[in-house]
Amino acid sequence: PNMYNINSAMEGRQYIYGLMGFDMHGKTAGIIGTGKIAKILIHILKGFGMNVLAYDLYPDYNFARQEQIVYTSLDELYHNSDIISLHCPLTEETKYLINDYSISKMKDGVMIINTGRGQLIHTNALIEGLKNKKIGSAGLDVYEEESEYFYEDQSDKIIDDDTLARLLSFNNVIVTSHQAFFTREALANIASTTLQNIKDFMNHKPLENEVKA
């Protein structure tokens, strides 16, 4: 379903054209990166009756046994997944992980979700995949050049980024402004973790969330 049709339904125009979806039950989700957020997502997807394939450089096999998921290669994940969701960090190895070549290995009509980092996806390759129907739909909470457009009201401005404008023109693409984290609970957790990190640093304790360069 696209946002135009959803808005039309809310305004009382109750037609079903363009609202055809698919059952998640029995479908296969491919999860790339299995950190904390991905593990919560996997638990939810299993509740919908989905099969889950996962890829991570450091597989958590105890978690895999608990949730009855399978760690596999990227090629196998691309080939067998109906939905692919990205949760890996952005590194030199993962930059443009989703590109023309990897998309060519995917199922026809695959759904791609990115709530990680914009540069995990080569945007022009994504657009080509959408144009030729290889990609059936996409949900993007991040975009390569998001700092120019996200977090501010752009409704009265002309988007001069032709790539973003093209993405927004597809009725099977939803772009949100890097707000997947934006809940009361998440903000409280961020504040609590930040304060604890400061406290640990001041008391010369090990820093649980330290990122080393």
List each language-model region with its residue ranges.
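Phosphate-binding beta-alpha-beta segment of Rossmann-like dinucleotide-binding domains, i.e.
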Residues: 1-28, 40-43
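Glycine-rich Rossmann-fold phosphate-binding loop(s) that bind the pyrophosphate
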Residues: 34-35
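NAD(P)-binding Rossmann-fold cofactor-contacting core
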Residues: 47-65, 143-145
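Short acidic low-complexity segments
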Residues: 65-81
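Short glycine-/small-residue-rich Rossmann-like dinucleotide-binding loops
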Residues: 82, 88-90, 116-117, 143-144
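Rossmann-fold NAD(P) dinucleotide-binding segment
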Residues: 93-112
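Rossmann-like dinucleotide-binding domain for NAD(H)/NADP(H)
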Residues: 109, 118-213
